[in-house]
UniProtKB/Swiss-Prot annotation:
SUPFAM superfamilies: Diaminopimelate epimerase-like. GO terms for biological process: biosynthetic process. The active site is at E46. This is Phenazine biosynthesis-like domain-containing protein 1. It comes from Mus musculus (Mouse). Pfam families: PhzC-PhzF (PF02567).
């Protein structure tokens, strides 16, 4: 087995920042177990597998492909940064000629289109609903202790818990906050929660670039203690902060150690455009 494989840093214009994803190009069907084995070997938060939908398709000419995403421990239904990385590989390395690519996925058809300063992902928007604090109190206290919480929401579509911290906290507080993810899967084992979003309101600017909101994302339930930059989490965050800020156009920053920027535009058709950059940092051949 020889497979072309790449690593791209997504949601960044600079190498070694953003969120790295492995991207594997499949000329033919791969044995089912091999997807997980390769993802475990790559040991990144996600490995993406792009496959041809028809034997006559071409990675350089076709505009529709199948796409799946695997963490080191399981397949996931949606991954934004690995979709961005996949589009970057096809556009910039494979020299695909199309302006828009369509990926057939577990979350339906997702589109990625070229932009002057990045790649725009066309994703669904997932609403959030008020969550009773007492139902998730043990989970939140285990993760962030006595940190003040302003709002708690739950996304039934994505099984993500969104915790908005007090507006008295700023970016530096969120960045330095020690989050204990190790006990979370044992505390929440019903399957209701598969990801934890922590978020704070942004600031008007000053000496730093203005962002509408900041976030961090944790998914120990699928083997990811903290994800550097998470496109799928922003399908939830965009819905929440659009309502809170009464804005359709927003700029977001995910406050992981690597950090990443996302430009968000909510559309009239109930979907969201998420724009980001990507830098390909490695290309090679998987020979196992």
């Amino acid at each position: 087995m020889k497979l072309p494989i790449f690593i791209a840093d997504a949601f960044t214009a600079t190498a070694f920042r953003g969120n790295p994803a492995a991207v594997c190009l499949l000329e033919r069907t791969l044995e089912e177990d091999a997807h997980q084995q390769i993802a475990r070997e790559m040991n990144l938060s996600e490995t993406a597998f792009i496959r041809k939908l028809q034997p006559t398709d071409s990675f350089t000419q076709s505009s529709r492909f199948g796409l799946r995403w695997f963490t080191p421990v399981s397949e996931v239904p949606l991954c934004g940064h690995a979709t961005l990385a996949s589009a970057a590989v096809l556009f910039h390395k494979i020299q695909n000629r199309n302006s828009t690519l369509t990926f057939v996925t577990m979350s339906g058809e997702l589109k990625a289109r070229r932009a002057e300063d990045g790649i725009v992902l066309d994703f669904p928007v997932y609403p959030t609903f008020p969550q009773d604090f007492h139902e998730v109190e043990d989970l939140i206290k285990a993760a962030i202790g006595d940190t003040l919480v302003q709002d708690i929401r739950y996304s039934t579509d994505t099984r993500k818990l969104l915790v908005r911290l007090s507006d008295s906290y700023d970016r530096s507080f969120l960045e330095s906050l020690k989050v204990n993810t190790e006990p979370l899967p044992a505390i929440e084992k019903t399957g209701k929660v598969r990801g934890l979003i922590l978020t704070v309101k942004g600031e008007p600017g000053g000496q730093t670039a203005p962002y509408d909101f900041y976030s961090r994302y944790f998914a120990p339930w699928v083997g990811i203690a903290e994800d550097p930059v998470t496109g799928s989490a922003h399908t939830v965050l965009s819905s929440y902060w659009s309502q809170q800020l009464r804005k359709k156009e927003m700029r977001a920053f995910q406050c992981s150690r690597r950090g990443g920027e996302l430009d968000i535009s909510l559309r009239p058709d109930g979907r969201v455009d998420i724009k980001g950059g990507a830098v390909i940092v490695l290309e090679g051949t998987l020979t196992a």
